[in-house]
């Protein structure tokens, strides 16, 4: 290879490397450095652990069962026990609330969508009637007939929003597929779909509204819908208020059952002990009775033998 060609090749390679270095190291022509995305820190929920709270409650109860515990330490532990039990109840209630929200989220969404659609339709109809050129009497009559439907639609809409989150949700609407005729309807309107999903109120067919519906209507008048949704209202809690005395009654019944079981067990033990003592006494009493009977039979047999001996001796003697 000639030297000139090698020098040209080297010069070309040096120029490419220098151009790359210039492109990399230069401030004007170089590409901007990629910035690292700074992710915000995740919000960590500092919820207590249920197992940890239960463990603490067991430890405190075990400590309170000690007889030699000082009075001041006992007071401190009793306060701690009350606090742990309250934290446990709050955590269980929070978990139950989140579970019920996840369970009925989609059903509530569909009901809210249908209720808002009905309410908007009725309000549009009311505006059309009020802007129409009808007589005052006819207009008044139609608006009065429409006012009841609007009120029911407003209650339905608030029912879907402010239903208590901690209770089982009872749906208001049921979806039905409405099929269309295939003959002249398709020829006239070919762009319309064959089936349409229609949501209808359940209590229109059954004639019975859910029990919470009346509570929502009353809360609309009182302005306590938020309390109803959070379950802080006496009427809205329903199940909670009924569950609390039932739990107390069940606790009392369990305590009574345990006391009766303990009494029955002690009575059984005492009956067993008395039965054993009676059996031992009967055995002791039966032993001398048997011995007396045996002795009587023995003496009677001996007397009979003596009589026989005397008679035999007299018979053979002459």
Curated annotation (Swiss-Prot):
Source superkingdom: Eukaryota
InterPro entries, A to Z: Efg1 (IPR019310), EFG1_rRNA-proc (IPR050786)
* GO annotation, biological process: maturation of SSU-rRNA from tricistronic rRNA transcript (SSU-rRNA, 5.8S rRNA, LSU-rRNA)
* One Gene Ontology cellular component annotation held by this UniProt entry: preribosome, small subunit precursor
Q: Where in the cell is it found?
A: Nucleus, Nucleolus
Show the taxonomic lineage.
Answer: Eukaryota, Fungi, Dikarya, Ascomycota, Pezizomycotina
- Tell me which stretches of the chain form a coiled coil: 49-69, 111-146
Q: Does the keyword NADP apply?
A: no
Please report the organism this UniProt entry assigns to the protein.
Neosartorya fischeri (strain ATCC 1020 / DSM 3700 / CBS 544.65 / FGSC A1164 / JCM 1740 / NRRL 181 / WB 181) (Aspergillus fischerianus)
Family label: Belongs to the EFG1 family.
**What is the official name of this protein in its record?**
rRNA-processing protein efg1
């Amino acid at each position: 290879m000639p030297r000139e060609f090698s020098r040209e090749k080297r010069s070309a390679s040096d120029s490419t490397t220098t151009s790359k270095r210039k492109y990399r190291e230069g401030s004007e022509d170089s590409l901007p450095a990629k910035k690292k995305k700074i992710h915000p820190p995740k919000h960590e929920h500092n919820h207590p652990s249920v197992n940890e709270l239960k463990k603490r409650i067991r430890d405190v109860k075990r400590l309170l069962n000690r007889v030699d515990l000082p009075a001041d330490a006992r007071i401190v532990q009793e306060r701690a026990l009350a606090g742990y039990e309250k934290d446990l109840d709050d955590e269980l209630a929070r978990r139950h609330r989140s579970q019920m929200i996840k369970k009925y989220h989609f059903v509530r969404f569909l009901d809210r969508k249908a209720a808002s659609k009905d309410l908007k339709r009725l309000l549009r109809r009311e505006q059309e009637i009020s802007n129409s050129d009808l007589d005052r009497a006819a207009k008044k009559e139609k608006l009065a007939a429409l006012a009841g439907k609007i009120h029911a639609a407003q209650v339905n809409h608030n029912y879907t929003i402010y239903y208590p989150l901690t209770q089982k949700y009872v749906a208001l609407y049921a979806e039905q597929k409405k099929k269309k005729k295939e003959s002249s309807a398709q020829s006239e309107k070919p762009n319309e779909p064959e089936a349409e999903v229609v949501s209808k109120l359940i209590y229109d067919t059954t004639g019975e509204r859910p029990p919470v519906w009346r509570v929502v209507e009353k809360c609309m008048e009182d302005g306590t819908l938020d309390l109803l949704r959070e379950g802080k209202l006496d009427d809205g809690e329903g199940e909670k208020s009924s569950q609390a005395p039932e739990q107390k009654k069940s606790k009392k019944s369990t305590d009574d059952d345990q006391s009766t079981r303990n009494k029955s067990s002690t009575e059984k033990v005492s009956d067993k002990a008395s039965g054993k003592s009676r059996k031992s006494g009967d055995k002791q009493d039966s032993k001398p009775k048997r011995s007396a009977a045996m002795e009587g039979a023995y003496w009677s047999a001996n007397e009979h033998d003596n009589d026989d001996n005397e008679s035999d001796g007299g018979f053979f003697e002459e």
